[in-house]
Amino acid sequence: MKKLLAGFLTLSLALAACSNGSDDDSSKKDDSSKDNQSSDDKSKDSKNDDKKNNDSDKDKDNNSDSDKNSDSKSDDSSSSDRNNGDDENSSDNASGSDSSSSNNDSNANSDGSSSNADGDNASGNNDNANNATSSESNGNENGAMNDANGSNSNDNASADANNGASSANTSQYVAPYQGQNAVPVAQNITSGTPDSQAALQNLPNFQNALDNATTEVNGLNGQSNPYNDYAIEGSEGNYSYIFSFQNQAQPGTYTIATVDQQGTVRVVDPAYQQ
């Protein structure tokens, strides 16, 4: 554009010079020189302007390239940021998934713990029920044992009472005696007169022997047969009592029983008649 302007000015000047042909040559030369100088200066200015414009265009191009590079870098940075954001989102999502999975595992473990707790509570309830049953069973067993012990105590008390009575009877000496209104029946059966003192030292206690013989005779006929009389027979080492009882099953007869040194009772005649 500047070149065209310079050319136009030059052409104008040339036309002006031609129209002013009346001027002297020196003036023309001077004017021509000035014009040429001015044209040269303008041409230089135009060149300088063109150079500046070119430099400016280059700078613009460089700036444009720099801007493009900068934009490219910015795009790369944005892409990298987006990728990083995507990676972070992926990481966050993965972390969230892991957290959710962990929470699910925790919830599952919590549920499992709750189930185990329920199982433990159920097991504890069963154990308590078993303990209650065992306690009740032990209570029943203890009650049964106490009852058995009470029964044993009663039995022992009865045995002790019997033993006490027997001991009292054994320890307390009772001299042999005949029955009330006795009829000599046993006395008539014996032969001879053995040493009564020696015989009593070898024979059982008189009262015990009489009680045992009475029990045996009453059991024989099922009656209460009154005691009648006694006698001692035998010799040294072989003594025995002879007892007679009024036979209530067959009135007028007597039941004869003997008791030896070992305390053995024998009914020798259930219905003796003299």
UniProtKB/Swiss-Prot annotation:
It comes from the Bacteria. Residues 1-17 form the signal peptide. Disulfide bonds: none annotated. A lipid is attached at residue 18 (S-diacylglycerol cysteine). Residues 91-169 have a biased composition (Low complexity). It is a lipid-anchor. Residues 18-169 are annotated as: Disordered. Keywords: Cell membrane, Lipoprotein, Membrane, Palmitate, Signal. Residues 25-76 have a biased composition (Basic and acidic residues). A lipid is attached at residue 18 (N-palmitoyl cysteine). GO terms for cellular component: plasma membrane. It is found in: Cell membrane. This is Uncharacterized lipoprotein SSP0535. It comes from Staphylococcus saprophyticus subsp. saprophyticus (strain ATCC 15305 / DSM 20229 / NCIMB 8711 / NCTC 7292 / S-41).
